[in-house]
Amino acid sequence: MAEWIALDQLLLEARPQRSVGLCDGEVIDHAGFRQRVLAWRAAFAAAEGRDWALYFDDAVAFAAALFGAWHAGKRVFLAADNLPATLQALQPQVSGFAGDVSADYRSLVALDAALDDELQALDERACELCVFTSGSTGQPSAIGKRLDQLAREVEALQAAFGAQMEGVQVHGTVSHQHIYGLLFRVLWPLAA
């Protein structure tokens, strides 16, 4: 993997030589990813309410919306899936939805943003998300996480496994909508 970038500083400058991943079959470099984040930041900044639910099938699209929401000062709720019962249960807790959800939920869409828009470092203690347990022992329970907690997890992964990761591609079997997929499939590869 490439040079380490702390998650709170991930998008301060565009790095076109750095690959982020594939989105809809297209290779996305860091500069392109940053532009997607700016577009989502514009959308979330224009949207009322603090709490937004995200569900995306694609991990890169998800990551862009996640960082866009955080850069707009929003708290993110990760829906475990996009089934009607899940979205209906989540609806009273959030201001709206973004991503691959039924048209009934009027998903927020990314807006155009200038390529030269600036992004500030994220406040790791202010950026929040809420993940849900699987519900295997009852109803899914909400678990709040801050970016500083997620960043420490990612740093621990890098310390334990980073030396073995040079030049590898990351393939995930756990959805990025769940904590392990979020850490292993999205946040760690972005930082590394």
Q: Locations of the language-model features?
A:
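Conserved AMP-binding A3 loop
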Residues: 29-30, 120, 128-155
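Flexible, low-complexity linker/hinge segments
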Residues: 102-127, 144, 153-154, 159
